[in-house]
């Protein structure tokens, strides 16, 4: 990932650090429609996720998370930017004429070949079942349910590790630190997701964040009492509570938000680290 640092010619470019290496390609049958986000509203138009709205118009890129082109070699033709995710994407041309997008594995370059299936080589970008992988393999785009496609470790720089196989299950250590069981028949892709240095980017100005559809975040302590439990007071007043609270009065820090008695509790051997 190439980070471009701007000269401090204006206040807006003083702290900017962006990636100028990867471009976007809109001339493709896999790119279609306008991706209309909900802007944080539900079906009734009520805000359910704050600090979202606006943003530049986006086209949706259809990503192949299933990797069901079995035993057919594909070649990486382009590495492109995707406005709908932090990770980059690769355009793959398969030997049978099929064209698909996949998540860009870290270190993959244009011209590399990939393949998916059982007992394929343990090579970066190849997709195969967990039962055919040796212990200690770094993987991403991991299936939870067989045939449903990858759902875990898909963000930029994400990587999981295969640490054990026993019976019908495999034990994985996820990027969050969680250790859980998954069926050995589920597939995953070898390697780490690319664009691992995304956290080194600095937008430099508020307008760049608005392009991404992110609105300003206002602290509760500067609001009025009617708007937030932390609001009110004369001048810079403390929150007036023993513990911080959400705008709706629930405990803000340290409270577990996971649903109790969830079906997957038996599959989680160690909770994620915070």
From Swiss-Prot:
Cited InterPro entries: NA-bd_OB-fold, Rib_uL2_dom2, Ribosomal_uL2, Ribosomal_uL2_bac/org-type, Ribosomal_uL2_C, Ribosomal_uL2_CS, Ribosomal_uL2_dom3, Ribosomal_uL2_RNA-bd_dom
Main location: plastid
Alphabetical UniProt keywords: Chloroplast, Plastid, Ribonucleoprotein, Ribosomal protein
Classification via Pfam families: Ribosomal_L2, Ribosomal_L2_C
Family, as annotated: Belongs to the universal ribosomal protein uL2 family.
Segments of this protein annotated with the region Disordered: 1-20, 224-274
Gene assigned in the entry: rpl2-B
Any one GO cellular component localisation term in the record: chloroplast
Complex formation: Part of the 50S ribosomal subunit.
SMART domains for the chain: Ribosomal_L2 (SM01383), Ribosomal_L2_C (SM01382)
GO-annotated molecular function: rRNA binding; structural constituent of ribosome; transferase activity
GO BP terms: mitochondrial translation
Protein name: Large ribosomal subunit protein uL2cy
Domain of life: Eukaryota
Localisation per UniProt entry: Plastid, Chloroplast
């Amino acid at each position: 990932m190439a980070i471009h640092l701007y000269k401090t010619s204006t206040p807006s470019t003083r702290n900017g650090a962006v990636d100028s290496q990867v471009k976007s390609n809109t001339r493709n049958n896999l790119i279609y429609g306008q991706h209309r986000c909900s802007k944080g509203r539900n079906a009734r138009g009520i805000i359910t996720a704050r600090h979202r709205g606006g943003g530049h118009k986006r086209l949706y890129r259809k990503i192949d998370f299933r990797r069901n082109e079995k035993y057919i070699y594909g070649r990486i033709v382009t590495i492109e930017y995707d406005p709908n995710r932090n990770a980059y994407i690769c355009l793959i041309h398969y030997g049978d004429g099929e064209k698909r997008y996949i998540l860009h594995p870290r270190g993959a370059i244009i011209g590399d070949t990939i393949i998916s299936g059982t007992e394929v080589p343990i090579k970066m970008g190849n997709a195969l079942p967990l039962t055919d992988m040796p212990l200690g393999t770094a993987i991403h785009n991991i299936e939870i349910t067989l045939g449903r496609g990858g759902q875990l470790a898909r963000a930029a720089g994400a990587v999981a590790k295969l640490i054990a196989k026993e019976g019908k299950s495999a034990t994985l250590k996820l990027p969050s630190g969680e250790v859980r069981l998954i069926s050995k028949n589920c597939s995953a892709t070898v390697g780490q997701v690319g664009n691992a240095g995304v956290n080194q980017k600095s937008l430099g100005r508020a307008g760049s964040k608005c392009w991404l559809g992110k609105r300003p975040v206002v602290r509760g302590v500067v609001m009025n009492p009617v708007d937030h439990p932390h609001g009110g007071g004369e001048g810079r007043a403390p929150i007036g509570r023993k513990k911080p609270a959400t705008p709706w009065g629930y405990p803000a820090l340290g409270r577990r938000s996971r649903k109790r008695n969830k079906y997957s509790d038996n599959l989680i051997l160690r909770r994620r680290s915070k």
